[in-house]
Amino acid sequence: MNDNLDLFSGAAPAAPESGAAPDKVLAKVQALRAQLNQWAHEYYVLDTPTVPDGEYDRVFQQLQALEGAYPELVTPDSPTQRVIGAVLDGLMPVRHAVPMLSIRTETDNEATGAEAFDARIRKELELAEGAPPVEYVAEPKFDGLAMNLRYENGRLVQATTRGDGEVGEDVTHNIRTIRKIPLSLPEGKGVPPVVEVRGEVYMGRADFVKLNERQQAAGGKSFANPRNAAAGSVRQLDSGIAAQRPLSFFAYGLGEITPAAQGGPDFVTHYAMLQTLRDWGFPVAPQVCIAKGAAELVAFHQRMGAERATLPYEIDGVVYKVNSLAQQRQLGFVSREPRWAVAHKYPAEEMPTRMEGIDIQVGRTGKLTPVARLAPVAVGGVIVTNATLHNLFEIRKKRVRTGDTVVVRRAGDVIPEVVGRVPGDRPAYVPNFRMPAACPICGSAVARPKGEANHRCTGGLFCPAQRKEAILHFAARRAMDIEGLGDKLVDQLVDGHVVRTLPDLYRLGLVALASLDRMAEKSAQNVLDALEKSKKTTLSRFLFGLGIRQVGESTAKDLARHFGQLDAIMDASVEQLLQVRDVGPIVAESIHTFFAQPHNREVVEQLRACGVHWEEGAAREQTAQPLAGMTVVLTGTLPTLGRDQAKEMLEAAGAKVSGSVSKKTSYVVAGAEAGSKLAKAEELGVTVLDEAGMLALLAGGDR
């Protein structure tokens, strides 16, 4: 290190005098930060360290000491602030300034799929047969977590997950801990006042293995794959935990950015934008390259497929993007997906291994699922020891028995499944597998309902396996939304016989909760507060939370709108239930059977007695349905209403909310960044409304 950076050598700084820090100290702090940022960039991004770790640590400690002596000099982008030890109560939702749209994934996963994409692009651009090849940027498709990094005046101010594309979660406290992500951008390199950099947070293969080794040594839970490890780390409330996880980042695009007319960069190509991101200190995948025409895209697909298993991080495919930004604008979007880009996934990876046995898992609805217990095998960089066999009929169809050598596939590169048996000798005297007659968890009888392939435990909420899953489902965000009631807490509550039924949740006390492992008084009070808050809900959320088989979120809303009151639903006949939109015989029978059980009715009444309530409404037949029979499409970002909120309002008025525009569409409600749906509506002559127009329509205004 240069001598002029040594403000003091090993000794603590002198006690500061009152008032602002001296100019000499400020200059030295800025110099130390610049040097540390440069070394960190060389080490974490360029992989070419120029100083020993000890030298970096020594300068880092000098900066820490100076900031400790002069706390007014501490800034959020200082290298010392990557880990601030903050523990949040929850992740805050953030609406994206520019929606994080997804790229269409082709079902054709062969390299030749690139030829079809290129042909489609040339047709859309109306290029003649002899015209020069289209220039693309070819990129690996990372298997991680999409992230939006917002910088204002060169400083990282917010990091947000993709979420549903419109609204994500603020995870800035954790993203600051990732060394490959710069906290500040360099001066003098054309960084605009506002820029959002988008990319993928991931965990390398070797880092993933080491993390699981540490987890196992500490008695913790291992992660199934690097993507789950990365996603779980990013969504931690405690940044100290995230800081211990070896996360990395690759940049691949932009969100909101200061326009060129206001001093922002004027990019001509996607590749030039990526090169600029490199110059600003962001890591960009080294495999990214320009490909001219279909032949070079095919070659890239084949090259990445051959290198895939040896890469230090997981990829599950490749992405092709038209390089010219002018051509991107010309191509536009369709169904909120860019026409100018496509993803091609590689086929699922398969490996042989020995099936050592078949275990039974009992799910939330009582379904018994046979699971193959396997000799450990690496499939796509993940050690697989279990794989689903789905049901008895699948086992018979695949003709697998204990002791067989079977082929295991990671379907979608995530879920392991047994594909089939490898022909050859099998051990003698191995009988065919039979489903148990009694539930392995509670001992209740097992039955297979008529017309179904699945066997089920008849124990209901009395079965601990169903009890845990039923409680977790009841507490889920889209059901009763009981924050803090997660897997580990539910395990303790059920295993400790503290909670046996759903109403028991609302009878919990502070002393009982606080006495559980890893549950301090403050955490216990937070759970109690969340339970109290959840008592005021909606009929559709309550119905969904009960976990009735075949009743998802949409069906629960339809039931609530049709009947208006819970008692009417509970007393409805199968014939009456069949009058509800999208409810068929199987769903109607499931609902009727659920409420015919005395113990289920008792649970409902006890929940009401505990204070769970909602606003009862009139039945649909008695309620005005101004938009009955109409189809409405939502597109873009509305000024004050979220997409889910607008959808609920429209559906409550009898409209069907569709995801695509056609001649049968009655209205298109358009907000900012409306895209191709708006263009399609104008082309077909469909009436377009803004948010105010939609509200007027709902209020009974002119159609």
Curated annotation (Swiss-Prot):
What is any Pfam family matched here?
DNA_ligase_aden
- Cofactor needs: Mg(2+); Mn(2+)
Superkingdom field: Bacteria
Q: Which UniProt keywords apply?
A: DNA damage, DNA repair, DNA replication, Ligase, Magnesium, Manganese, Metal-binding, NAD, Zinc
Which spans does this entry mark as compositional bias, Low complexity? 9-20
Question: Which is a Gene Ontology cellular component entry for this protein?
Answer: cytosol
Q: Name one GO biological process term.
A: DNA repair
Residue ranges of domain BRCT in the record: 622-703
Group of enzyme by EC: ligase
Question: Which residues does NAD(+) bind?
Answer: 53-57, 102-103, 139, 162, 200, 321, 345
Reactions that this protein is recorded to catalyse? NAD(+) + (deoxyribonucleotide)n-3'-hydroxyl + 5'-phospho-(deoxyribonucleotide)m = (deoxyribonucleotide)n+m + AMP + beta-nicotinamide D-nucleotide
EC number assigned by the record:
6.5.1.2
Q: Which residues form the active site?
A: 141 (n6-amp-lysine intermediate)
MF terms in GO: DNA binding; DNA ligase (NAD+) activity; metal ion binding
Question: Which amino acid positions bind Zn(2+), per UniProt?
Answer: 439, 442, 457, 463
PROSITE patterns in the cross-refs = BRCT, DNA_LIGASE_N1, DNA_LIGASE_N2
InterPro entries to which the protein is assigned, alphabetical: BRCT_dom (IPR001357), BRCT_dom_sf (IPR036420), DisA/LigA_HHH (IPR041663), DNA_ligase (IPR001679), DNA_ligase_AS (IPR018239), DNA_ligase_CS (IPR033136), DNAligase_adenylation (IPR013839), DNAligase_N (IPR013840)
Q: Where is this region: Disordered?
A: 1-20
Q: What does this protein do?
A: DNA ligase that catalyzes the formation of phosphodiester linkages between 5'-phosphoryl and 3'-hydroxyl groups in double-stranded DNA using NAD as a coenzyme and as the energy source for the reaction. It is essential for DNA replication and repair of damaged DNA.
Q: Which family does it belong to?
A: Belongs to the NAD-dependent DNA ligase family. LigA subfamily.
* Protein name, as recorded: DNA ligase
Q: Which gene specifies this protein's sequence?
A: ligA
